[in-house]
């Protein structure tokens, strides 16, 4: 009988059932208990017999037999001797598989330190003993003695003595008066002698006493390690090894190659070194060799063991014969090729194939074309079993032959096997879950896989040679999941934003667009048709054209379910399109009675999905695809070079811009503007010109042309392609027929001279050269950024992988407030789009009538959002993942709608991974898309505010002055202009820049499009608030101010230079003061002098003695020249935000509300303090480098959270000062801005899920009576548990603040050490986990994949739940039995059967 079958019933090692895994330091006893024998010899196998040497590294006596059930000498063979130990060769007769699990050990002649606990920073041994790593190494490597027991001598405990000092001390105090040792033995004794309880108490006392922050931190670190050893059951001396375990031989195999040579695992070499040195040391000790030789041997043994555990961490890397570093045990786990990432998290699978893909337009959406040859190979086992079942073959061999000969009956059987058996298609790179989808295979001839055109956008596939892999789900459960969850027909919506992803593109869009065009004056205009037959007849007999305006009787079912008839004005093409639309009262003909662009089609699909359900949508999609292809082919659209129309006004615009640029040049030569300002203005002028030419071109291309008979001519084909969204964009058309415009240098700056030609006219040599910059940069960027994007996705997945929907509702009353996002007066994200599919955190009421629109706790659907919009609600509080109160995972209410299904989210959905994929996937796509516009520069600098509504002006914090030129100027930074509609609702608010010209005032009525304010975007002014005479302070020629002569103009301009770097300039405080008629410095209205401090690089606009009025400009600070905004700023920016890095020049934020006061300067920093408005708070002081521009004056009032120094705020500051909600809003907005710039839609909830994971830790501020240490970071779960325990025992709980961790840090500090170790820094994670005796509860996805279980998400989540219920029932039954046994001790065994409690 087959051995394997026998072994099913008595496996060599029983399968283990476990709920958690614990890791700790192995004690010598533990290592010996694992071992099956000591390895005494370094030999591996005998070179003649090829049998393993006894007591060697492959010894059969220790590790088990080489062949199944056969001892080494061959005396006992076969199953019947199972378990016997041969008396000749001492080998147990058993399965050879035990060679994979039996371990051995090496008994060391001298103890050695474990390198991970010694060298992995921070050094655990060093921290416990409070010694530096340098000192430890000196002891370990036999340079210095350490005093263990000073006795009555003057020596101190743990004092280091060199050889001479040691001998001198022995002479001085006598041989036995003190104990000092050297080497690992000494450190082992020190560790053994530690009294952890005593040290713990001592450290806590010291921490209470110390005031120094640094010392407190140092003590806290040491205390943490002491506690780790106290509570984990690890003993400190176990960090020094006396026994080294040897891993099973089949995990470090020796494989014979042809030609009599062997390939071996590096570990064997490393073990051999250890054994050789150990044996030599034993021999030297027996021979009583001189001390110096023994010490050298011990040092070499330490080095050998170090190399075995972690080669290259200390000293030189040990290399093999071919100068290649040997792979140590640590290297086996680390990195992409290590055990975790190569074998445990990413396995290769059988039953798969790959081939090139071609388009399959006649397939249905749920089908894919599978080549017959491929199917035959993939489904072989199924075919064999079916052949056997049908009696066509009796043995596997026969079946094999039939299949190889490809007999007709085999093809019939293949058809049966494949029917209803889905296969998975995958296209690399799999950036999100739609990169693997299930299809039903259709057998085809040929060797290429056929793919349905509509799923291409989900796979990001095209047919230019892409390849795809096919996988076969084998088990019934796998087939079920593939069909129900992964079928392409079940993935119509994009998980990132809930929009349809099965959308037509390219040819299909063009065909549908062509079908829906309406033109005036075509033959048959105004005819009326009663039904489709008539219409088709007229079309075929050419009485009417597809685009003719006609009237048609449309039969339709209204909301009440009655049949109604409408007379429509439409075109023949649109009627044909209307035939495929599902009949539903919610889908009137108006949905498609318009020009169908890609956007419109996507909208129609979305509506069909929401109103008619999934099945109808799939049918509809397939039908419009066929229609689109057919009409694109019928239309026969093509284009020639005359279709690219160069606008007639092009040269006029170019000439006028050239004149303008000359003017700027002249102004610069006259010294009116600086070089930077000239550059900005020229670039601005040219980008405006480019836009204008593009506009003109679009106007001419899209213009309606009339034929001689008055009918409209065919639309320009290039315009059709771009306008429909089939191919090309206005930006590309501009380059073809307008002007290419400005180009960027590789550094990102814009070249001042634009490319005036377009591709139709052809570029001159110089223009061509200028344009190569941008193109080349685009290509280089792509290569670099694809990698970065992949790495970002990996970090995101890692931080969010254990975020799963675990409950329906956590019942929290917390939430975050949502408003529309307005950028520069235009709404970039409406309130409706942000709250759709979220749960209301409180009742949403109509502001006018106060009636409830949405109840608290209800999911907001499309109709609710529409109602909220109609009511004019400005702000809605919603539930969010950030405020969900569940300990593990997130609840369904806080998450809201599952975007990919359009229904409330299911229990067990892995929302963390979906969030990570949704954020990471466009990253890669964007990086690949940078160069499409060929580096053509895109500038957008907003410097005008126009009203978007009619209404009345309300100004908050009004401060307006009329300057010398008669303009109204904003004098403060926090002035806000709001536009209010007649019933008092705020429609828009605009923050007005300091120094902006304001064109309206309080109470004015404005019309839509009216200009409210404008400013110069390239400079920041410093304005005067009083009328008087200018005087300078500390503005000394060549010390704090320099007159620079512009070489090209000969005009001088005065710029403030860095005065600290000049001689004697350290105490200067350059300023402009304004004096009255009496020559004294004037006072400002709010107190303080009229003294305006200047920062480096300020350009003076006034002279001494000049008269100024309020609102006049004293000086201006030029801002950076405009860089192109490209995703280059994008990806690194997203990574920076998720990693929560402090920006380089971070903004300084006011921590309290109060009044600004300037204090005495400190070295080269300015001292600024805020006197609080609230008397209970303490004043705050800030030191600000002198070069930074502080735009506040003495006596200004700031609000909590206002910027004192401009810049990007550090997210940690926002969290500390304004709290979680503000931080979330900031991160969500900043990240969304990057994606919005690229036109990528991502739902806010995905970013919220990631931010939630970044906020899982709490920093203890006061430890109370708990065991936590103030200053340490604790997991939220642990924090709450320990505090609950403290409250229960009547003790004082600890307090703490949430801390924001970057995603990498958060991943490494997750509760699961498996997850962290498989992410990065494996050594450090495992060392720390072992010292703490960490327990991995196996809650996340990664840990479960690593231990080889179903993940606790999706179908795995329900399995886990069922298991929980079963355990509970079993417990109940056992408890019941125990009770009964207690009541009736001598009852008969036939107790009545227990009734089972109902399942939950």
Curated annotation (Swiss-Prot):
Which segments cross the bilayer?
none
List this protein's GO terms for biological process.
Answer: DNA-templated transcription
UniProt: Zn(2+) 1 binding residues: 71, 73, 86, 89
Which cysteines share a disulfide bond?
none
The free-text cofactor remark is: Binds 1 Mg(2+) ion per subunit. Binds 2 Zn(2+) ions per subunit.
Binding sites annotated in the UniProt record for Mg(2+): 462, 464, 466
> What does the subunit section of this Swiss-Prot or TrEMBL entry state?
The RNAP catalytic core consists of 2 alpha, 1 beta, 1 beta' and 1 omega subunit. When a sigma factor is associated with the core the holoenzyme is formed, which can initiate transcription.
Name under which the protein is recorded: DNA-directed RNA polymerase subunit beta'
What organism does the UniProt record list as the source? Rhodopseudomonas palustris (strain TIE-1)
Encoding gene (name): rpoC
């Amino acid at each position: 009988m087959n051995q394997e079958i026998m072994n099913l019933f008595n496996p060599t090692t029983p399968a283990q059932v476990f709920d958690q895994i614990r890791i700790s330091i192995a004690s010598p006893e533990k290592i010996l208990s694992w071992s099956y024998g000591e390895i005494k010899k370094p030999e591996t196998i005998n070179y003649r017999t090829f049998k393993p040497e006894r007591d060697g590294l492959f010894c059969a006596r220790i590790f088990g037999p080489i062949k199944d059930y056969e001892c080494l000498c061959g005396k006992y063979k076969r199953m019947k001797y199972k378990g016997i130990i041969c008396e000749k060769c001492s080998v147990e007769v058993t399965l050879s598989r035990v060679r994979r699990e039996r371990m051995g050990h090496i008994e060391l002649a001298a103890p050695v330190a474990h390198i991970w606990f010694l060298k992995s920073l921070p050094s655990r041994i060093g921290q416990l003993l409070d010694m530096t790593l340098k000192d430890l190494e000196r002891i370990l490597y036999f340079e210095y003695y350490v005093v263990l027991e000073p006795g009555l001598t003057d020596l101190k405990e743990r004092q280091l003595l060199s050889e001479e000092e040691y001998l001198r001390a022995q002479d001085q105090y006598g041989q036995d008066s003190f104990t000092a040792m050297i080497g690992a033995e000494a450190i082992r004794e020190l560790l053994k002698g530690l009294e952890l309880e005593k040290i713990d108490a001592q450290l806590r006392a010291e921490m209470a006493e110390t005031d120094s922050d640094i010392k407190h931190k140092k003590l806290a670190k040491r205390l943490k390690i002491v506690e780790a050893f106290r509570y984990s059951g690890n003993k400190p001396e176990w960090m020094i090894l006396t026994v080294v375990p040897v891993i099973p031989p089949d995990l470090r195999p020796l494989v014979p190659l042809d030609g009599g040579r062997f390939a071996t695992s590096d570990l064997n070499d490393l073990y051999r070194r250890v054994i050789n040195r150990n044996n030599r040391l034993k021999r030297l000790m027996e021979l009583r060799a001189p001390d110096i030789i023994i010490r050298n041997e011990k040092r070499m043994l330490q080095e050998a063991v170090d190399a075995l555990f972690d080669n290259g961490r200390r000293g030189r890397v040990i290399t093999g014969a071919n100068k290649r570093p040997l792979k140590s045990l640590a290297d086996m786990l680390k990195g992409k090729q290590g055990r975790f990432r190569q074998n445990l998290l990413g396995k290769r699978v059988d039953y798969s194939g790959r081939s090139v893909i071609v388009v399959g337009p006649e397939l249905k959406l749920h089908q894919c074309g599978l080549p017959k040859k491929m199917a035959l190979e993939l489904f072989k086992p199924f075919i064999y079993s079916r052949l056997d079942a049908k009696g066509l073959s009796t043995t596997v061999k026969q079946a094999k032959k039939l299949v190889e000969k490809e007999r007709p009956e085999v093809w019939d059987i293949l058809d049966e096997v494949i029917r209803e058996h889905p296969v998975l298609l995958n296209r690399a790179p799999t950036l999100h879950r739609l990169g693997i989808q299930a299809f039903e295979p259709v057998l085809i001839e040929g060797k290429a896989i056929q793919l349905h055109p509509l799923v291409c956008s989900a796979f990001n596939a095209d047919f230019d040679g892409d390849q795809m892999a096919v996988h076969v789900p084998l088990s019934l459960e796998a087939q079920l999941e593939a069909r129900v969850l992964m079928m392409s027909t079940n993935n119509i919506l994009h998980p990132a934003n809930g929009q349809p992803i099965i959308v037509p593109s390219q040819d299909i869009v063009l065909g549908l667009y062509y079908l829906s065009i309406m033109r005036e004056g075509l033959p048959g205009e105004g005819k009326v048709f009663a039904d489709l037959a008539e219409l088709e007849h007229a079309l075929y007999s050419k009485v009417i054209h597809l685009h003719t305006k006609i009237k048609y009787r449309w039969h339709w079912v209204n909301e009440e379910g009655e049949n109604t008839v409408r007379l429509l004005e439409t075109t023949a093409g649109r009627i044909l399109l209307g035939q495929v639309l599902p009949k539903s009262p919610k889908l009137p003909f108006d949905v498609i009675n318009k020009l169908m662009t890609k956007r419109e089609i996507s909208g129609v699909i979305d509506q069909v999905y929401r109103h008619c359900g999934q099945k109808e949508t799939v049918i509809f999609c397939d039908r419009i695809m066929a229609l689109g292809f057919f009409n694109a082919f019928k239309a026969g659209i093509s284009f020639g070079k005359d279709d690219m129309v160069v606008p007639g006004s092009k040269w006029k615009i170019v000439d006028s811009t050239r004149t303008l640029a000359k003017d700027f040049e002249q102004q610069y030569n006259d010294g009116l503007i600086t070089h930077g300002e000239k550059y900005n203005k020229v670039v601005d002028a040219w980008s405006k010109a480019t836009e204008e030419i593009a506009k003109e071109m679009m106007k001419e291309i899209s213009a309606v042309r009339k034929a001689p008979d008055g009918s409209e001519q065919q639309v320009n084909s290039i315009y059709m392609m771009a306008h429909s969204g089939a191919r090309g964009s206005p930006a590309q058309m501009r380059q073809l027929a307008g002007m290419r415009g400005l180009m960027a240098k590789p550094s990102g700056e814009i070249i001042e001279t634009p490319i005036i030609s377009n591709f139709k006219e052809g570029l001159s040599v110089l223009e061509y050269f200028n344009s190569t910059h941008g193109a080349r940069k685009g290509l280089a960027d792509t290569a670099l950024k694809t990698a970065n994007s992949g790495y970002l996705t990996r970090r995101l997945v890692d931080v969010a992988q254990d975020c799963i929907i675990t409950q329906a509702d956590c019942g929290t009353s917390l939430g975050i407030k949502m408003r529309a996002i307005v950028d520069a007066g235009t709404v970039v994200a409406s309130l409706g789009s942000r709250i759709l599919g979220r749960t209301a955190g409180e009742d949403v009421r109509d502001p006018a009538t106060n009636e409830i629109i949405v109840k608290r706790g209800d999911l907001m659907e499309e109709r609710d959002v529409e109602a909220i919009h109609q009511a004019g609600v400005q702000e809605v509080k919603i539930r969010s993942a950030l405020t969900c109160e569940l300990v593990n995972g997130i609840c369904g209410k806080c998450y809201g709608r599952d975007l990919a299904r359009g229904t409330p989210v299911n229990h067990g959905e892995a929302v963390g991974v979906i969030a990570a994929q949704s954020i990471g996937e466009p990253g890669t796509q964007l990086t690949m898309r940078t160069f499409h516009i060929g580096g053509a520069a895109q500038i957008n600098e907003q410097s005008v505010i126009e009203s978007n509504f009619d209404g009345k002006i309300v100004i908050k914090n009004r401060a307006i002055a009329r300057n010398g030129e008669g303009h109204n100027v904003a004098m403060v930074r926090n002035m806000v202009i709001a536009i209010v509609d007649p019933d008092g609702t705020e429609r828009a608010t605009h923050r007005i820049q300091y120094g902006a010209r304001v064109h309206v005032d309080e109470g004015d009525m404005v019309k839509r499009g009216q200009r409210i304010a404008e400013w110069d975007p390239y400079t920041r002014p410093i304005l005067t608030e009083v009328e008087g005479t200018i005087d300078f302070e500390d503005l000394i020629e060549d010390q704090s101010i320099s007159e620079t002569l512009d070489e090209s103009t000969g005009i001088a301009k005065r710029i403030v230079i860095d005065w600290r770097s000049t001689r004697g300039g350290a105490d200067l405080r350059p300023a402009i003061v304004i004096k009255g008629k009496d020559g004294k410095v004037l006072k400002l209205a709010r107190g303080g002098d009229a003294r305006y401090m200047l920062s480096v690089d300020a350009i003076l606009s006034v002279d001494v003695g000049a008269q100024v009025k309020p609102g006049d400009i004293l000086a201006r600070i030029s801002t950076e020249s405009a860089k192109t905004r490209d995703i280059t700023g994008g990806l690194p920016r997203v990574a920076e935000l998720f990693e929560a890095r402090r920006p380089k020049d971070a903004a300084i934020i006011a921590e309290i509300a109060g009044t600004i006061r300037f204090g005495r300067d400190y070295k080269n920093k300015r001292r600024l303090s805020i006197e609080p408005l609230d008397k209970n708070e303490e004043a705050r002081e800030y030191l600000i480098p002198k070069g930074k521009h502080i735009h506040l004056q003495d006596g200004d009032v700031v609000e909590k959270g206002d910027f004192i120094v401009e810049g990007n705020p550090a997210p940690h500051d926002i969290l500390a000062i304004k709290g979680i909600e503000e931080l979330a809003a900031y991160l969500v907005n900043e990240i969304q801005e990057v994606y919005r710039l690229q036109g990528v839609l991502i739902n806010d909830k995905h970013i919220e899920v990631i931010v939630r994971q970044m906020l899982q830790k709490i920093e203890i501020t006061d430890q109370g009576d708990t065991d936590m240490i103030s200053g340490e970071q604790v997991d939220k779960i642990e924090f709450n548990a320990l505090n609950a325990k403290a409250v229960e025992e009547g003790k004082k709980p600890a307090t703490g603040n949430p801390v924001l961790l970057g995603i990498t840090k958060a991943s490494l500090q997750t509760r699961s050490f498996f997850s962290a170790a498989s992410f990065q820094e494996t050594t450090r994670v495992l060392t720390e986990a072992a010292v703490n005796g960490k327990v991995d509860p196996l809650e996340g996805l990664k840990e479960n994949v690593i231990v080889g279980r179903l993940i606790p998400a999706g179908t795995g989540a329900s399995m886990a739940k069922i298991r929980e219920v079963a355990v509970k029932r079993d417990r109940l039954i056992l408890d019941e039995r125990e009770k009964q046994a207690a009541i009736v001790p001598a009852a008969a065994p036939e107790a009545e059967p227990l009734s089972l409690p109902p399942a939950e």
